């Protein structure tokens, strides 16, 4: 693992306990990392979503113990059909999120551990699943970390990403051997056909492509809640091309007081996939830092900085 645990984090590791959640599609295996009793309580439970529950290089394990040492409780779990959970597995589609799984975990934590307020974090499919929880649990969710997720149907994402290409891009692509090898895959042929079609028609306008109905419904539930949210993308992410349509439409229509709850960050390069170690660590650090700022002590310190008064102890 790419980190060394502090004594406080090791204590949180030893305090972890597994539990099982009954969900409609299977019994979900989960791990609770309880907040350090000596830390100022955040009164928030952070639920991290991915497959498997540890994420790449066990970064959600690292995050769970670091946050718990600061007074957050945390939960990581396996979706149905994944890892140690029961149920049937299937190809994942961000527009068909596993809402029942995450809602079951939230309600189990409330009933069994007395947790009342939650923060959800995930990337791509997991971000869309986290967002979907607002439809049934918006009143109990205080924060959302939404990393590099598509907000259109997957076939539409391909089209909107194709609209960022031109003939010069296609010409350069012809001279890359990896592109020719990739054409052995049927899905790559379909993608290339879409790119050529969109470029040849010179549509160049993603505005003619719709956002996913599921995203719009879940986004409206987020708006109705009082939660804060961080939306983070890479400029070169295919998913960002679809999110730009959301920026121009559903985000632009928000009242100022609602829009102020949502932060949008677009970084150079890519964020999606966590495939490159340096960017993975940068994204992880940003997500944890954003969550840490939700701690009441952090908010009190920021308020004191603005007023010039000492923060309450």
Region locations from a protein language model:
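N-terminal cap/lid segment of alpha/beta-hydrolase-fold proteins
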Residues: 1-41, 276
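Serine-hydrolase catalytic core
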Residues: 7, 11-13, 22, 61-63, ...
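Short, surface-exposed "cap/lid" segments of acyl-processing enzymes
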Residues: 25, 35-78
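Glycine-rich "HGGG/HGxG" loop immediately N-terminal to the catalytic nucleophile
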Residues: 77-93
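Alpha/beta-hydrolase active-site loop
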Residues: 91-112
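Alpha/beta-hydrolase fold nucleophile elbow
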Residues: 112-124
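Short glycine-enriched nucleophile-adjacent loop
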Residues: 127-138, 144
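Active-site nucleophile loop of the alpha/beta-hydrolase fold
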Residues: 145-156
């Amino acid at each position: 693992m790419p980190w060394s645990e502090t004594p406080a984090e090791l204590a949180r590791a030893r305090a972890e306990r597994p539990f099982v959640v009954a969900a409609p599609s299977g019994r979900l295996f989960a791990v609770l990392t309880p907040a350090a009793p000596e830390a100022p309580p955040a009164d928030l439970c952070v639920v991290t979503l991915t497959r498997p529950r540890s994420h790449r290089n066990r970064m959600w394990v690292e995050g769970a113990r670091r946050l718990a040492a600061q007074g957050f409780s945390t939960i990581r779990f396996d979706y149905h059909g994944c890892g140690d959970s029961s149920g049937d597995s299937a190809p994942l589609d961000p527009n068909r999120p596993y809402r029942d799984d995450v809602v079951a975990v939230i309600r189990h934590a409330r009933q069994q551990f007395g947790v009342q307020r939650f923060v959800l974090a995930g990337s791509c499919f997991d971000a869309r699943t986290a967002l979907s929880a607002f439809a049934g649990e918006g009143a109990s969710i205080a924060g959302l970390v939404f990393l590099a997720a598509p907000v259109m149907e997957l076939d539409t994402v391909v089209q909107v990403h194709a609209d960022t290409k031109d003939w010069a891009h296609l010409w350069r692509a012809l001279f890359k051997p990896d592109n020719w090898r990739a054409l052995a895959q049927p899905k790559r042929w379909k993608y290339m056909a879409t790119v050529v079609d969109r470029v040849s028609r010179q549509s160049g306008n993603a505005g003619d492509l719709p956002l996913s109905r599921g995203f719009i419904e879940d986004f409206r539930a987020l708006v109705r809640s009082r939660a804060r949210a961080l939306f983070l993308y890479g400029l070169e992410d295919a998913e960002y091309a679809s999110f730009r349509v959301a920026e121009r439409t559903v985000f632009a229509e928000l009242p100022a007081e609602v829009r102020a709850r949502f932060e949008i960050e677009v970084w150079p390069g890519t964020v999606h996939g966590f495939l490159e170690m340096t960017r993975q660590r940068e994204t992880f650090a940003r997500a944890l830092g954003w969550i840490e700022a939700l701690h009441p002590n952090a908010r009190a310190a920021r308020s004191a900085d603005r007023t010039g008064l000492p923060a309450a102890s």
